[in-house]
């Protein structure tokens, strides 16, 4: 049975004692990292979130404490009181390594079974074990540091936004389902049988209603939920730094958020973000980097060589050009020494992105070698080399297809080459860029209609208003994403505040008046009462913490995350509920083929 504190107070944390505390009597509380016997002495490494302190027990120091210490085991929770003394054998690898505590009294506050994972920094336990015993995983000091960073970050965000006249307003968690976008998490209503709430994918409509309400500047650190197939670094529930502003244009919102980013990264990481953050249009990003979230920590831009090869009698190039596509390439410095096998592997790699293959040209000391040598002339080869700014020792990697395939495959290849050839020299660099002028619509082959690239409330560029009905595929939007090191950190847009324009948008999306009224009627009703021009943005807080904490795993920055199948090993959620609960809700579970997707 564990002992009680009985008024005993902790006077220092385990990671705090230093040489200047020698001779001072202190009380520490924490968990036993390990204990060991050395001659007539018993040593215990005591750990809390701040670090580890060595505690020494001996017959001559205190016989009762010495006897009790013999029984402690790993992860026992204890309180120790004694005098800080200099260590005979210094451990320079520990901040407390110059001192130790001569223990005069120990209280065993609670005992521990043998833990399923050993609490250490270089933990090698399987992820499912870490998630099942997350409370033990979180005892590690490097995990504590991550959540200290998270706490500092949210404080810095709140401080900045409130200094800039933003108001923190909570929006509903139980809301209305909208089939546009990802699947909703649905919550059945007991009071309204057969009807459901939805957990919010974002506070989008409610924050726009707050602008109609005259709140002017709103923010919220909001929980959001999406029932989607989880890719790497996605969670079914996540946190957004959400905001909306009235009487603003795109540049106003970008300026506010540049200030926010600069403030947070300086306060939390000591990083000076260079302002203003550079801008790049969606079109330029796709043509140069094959991605709407380009990693700009290295070069290797995609180059259009269509003009150089348009007269070649090579069916792959010719058919791509005739179909309205293009021929584009990357220049891999020092790639001329690559053998046929690695080049073939790169060819297989681009095929996974729907490219038909990869042509290549290597510029060697003794001439040019190419997979399409029999189709090339000296003039065309020289023209390609000049356009690519290639030099002796380089390799030119070429894809020909419709533009969407060319961009996607070469964009992915660019990132793959960066990994293989270690092209990102400064892994600690924070390289920000704004991506602007996204398409307003994207065509869904599956549904045979245009869909909103972002959401149906995004405003089109003024100069493209006339093309919403006649040429929707080429209409640009007043949408913007903030990209950091090839990851989308946040995104937003100027919203449509004109009812007539909003109705045109819904019609272009193929939504009937009945559907629009059912899904968004309450927003459109509000827009009859003088909505201001407004816009906003949302940052992914979890992703921001990943960058600030230097981790690549989103589960590290969420206290109790789910696995890739949205399963919680700790609480074993989701779970089967009582039949009585289902009956109250008017729900019957249909039989389904059983499968285990927990892993």
UniProtKB/Swiss-Prot annotation:
Acetylation listed as a keyword: no
Keyword Kinase included in the entry's annotation: no
Record's catalysed reaction(s): tRNA(Asp) + L-aspartate + ATP = L-aspartyl-tRNA(Asp) + AMP + diphosphate
Transmembrane feature ranges: none
EC code(s) of this entry: 6.1.1.12
UniProt binding sites for ATP: 226-228, 235, 488, 540-543
GO MF entry, a single one: aspartate-tRNA ligase activity
Residues reported in the UniProt entry to bind L-aspartate: 180, 226, 454, 495
Enzyme class name: ligase
Region (Aspartate): 204-207
Family as reported in the entry's similarity comment: Belongs to the class-II aminoacyl-tRNA synthetase family. Type 1 subfamily.
Protein name: Aspartate--tRNA ligase
Record organism: Clostridium beijerinckii (strain ATCC 51743 / NCIMB 8052) (Clostridium acetobutylicum)
Gene assigned in the entry: aspS
């Amino acid at each position: 049975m564990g002992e009680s504190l009985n008024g005993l107070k902790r006077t220092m944390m385990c990671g705090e004692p230093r040489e200047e505390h020698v001779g001072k009597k202190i009380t520490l509380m924490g968990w036993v990292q390990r204990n060991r016997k050395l001659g007539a002495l018993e040593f215990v490494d005591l750990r809390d979130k701040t670090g580890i302190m060595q505690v020494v027990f001996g017959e001559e120091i205190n016989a009762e404490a010495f006897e009790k210490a013999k029984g402690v085991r790993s992860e026992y929770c204890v309180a120790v009181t004694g005098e800080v003394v200099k260590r005979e054998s210094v451990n320079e690898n520990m901040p407390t390594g110059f001192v130790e505590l001569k223990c005069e009294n120990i209280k065993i506050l609670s005992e521990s079974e043998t833990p399923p994972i050993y609490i250490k920094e270089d933990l090698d336990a399987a992820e499912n074990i870490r998630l099942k015993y997350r409370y033990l995983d979180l005892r590690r000091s490097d995990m504590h540091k991550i959540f200290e960073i998270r706490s500092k970050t949210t404080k810095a965000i709140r401080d900045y936004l409130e200094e800039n006249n933003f108001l923190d307003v909570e929006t509903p968690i139980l809301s209305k389902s909208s089939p546009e976008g990802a699947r909703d998490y649905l919550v059945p209503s007991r009071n309204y049988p057969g009807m459901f709430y939805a957990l919010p994918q974002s506070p989008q409509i409610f924050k726009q209603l707050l602008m109609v309400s005259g709140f002017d500047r709103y923010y919220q650190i909001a929980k959001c939920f999406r029932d989607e197939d989880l890719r790497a670094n996605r969670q079914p529930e996540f946190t957004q730094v959400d905001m909306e502003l009235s009487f603003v244009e795109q540049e106003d919102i970008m300026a506010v958020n540049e200030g926010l980013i600069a403030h947070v990264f300086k306060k939390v990481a000591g990083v000076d973000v260079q302002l203003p953050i550079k801008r790049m249009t969606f079109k330029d990003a796709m043509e140069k980097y094959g991605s709407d979230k380009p990693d700009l920590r290295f070069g290797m831009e995609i180059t259009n060589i269509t003009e150089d090869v348009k007269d070649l009698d090579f069916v792959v190039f010719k058919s791509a050009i005739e179909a309205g596509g293009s021929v584009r390439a990357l220049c891999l410095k020092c790639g001329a020494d690559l053998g046929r096998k690695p080049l073939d592997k790169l060819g297989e790699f681009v095929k996974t992105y729907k490219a038909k293959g990869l042509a290549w040209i290597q510029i060697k000391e003794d001439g040019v070698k190419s997979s399409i040598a029999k189709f090339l002339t000296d003039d065309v080869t020289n023209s390609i080399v000049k356009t690519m700014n290639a030099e002796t020792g380089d390799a030119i990697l070429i894809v020909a297809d419709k533009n969407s395939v060319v961009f996607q495959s070469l964009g992915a290849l660019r990132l793959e080459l960066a990994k293989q050839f270690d092209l990102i020299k400064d892994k600690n660099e924070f390289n920000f860029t704004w991506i602007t002028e996204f398409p307003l619509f994207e065509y869904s082959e599956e549904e045979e209609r245009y869909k909103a690239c972002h959401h149906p409330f995004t405003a089109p560029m003024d100069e493209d208003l006339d093309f919403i009905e006649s040429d929707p595929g080429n209409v640009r939007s007043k949408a913007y994403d903030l990209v950091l090191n090839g990851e989308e950190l946040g995104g937003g847009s100027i919203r449509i505040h004109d009812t007539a324009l909003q109705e045109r948008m819904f019609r272009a999306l193929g939504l009937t008046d009945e559907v629009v009224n059912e899904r968004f009627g309450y927003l459109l009703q509000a827009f009859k009462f003088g909505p201001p021009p407004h816009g906003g943005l949302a940052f992914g807080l979890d992703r921001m913490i990943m960058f600030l904490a230097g981790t690549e795993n989103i589960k590290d920055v969420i206290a109790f995350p789910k696995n890739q199948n949205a399963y919680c090993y700790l609480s074993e959620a989701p779970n089967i509920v009582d039949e009585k609960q289902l009956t109250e809700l008017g729900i019957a579970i249909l039989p389904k083929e059983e499968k285990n997707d927990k892993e």
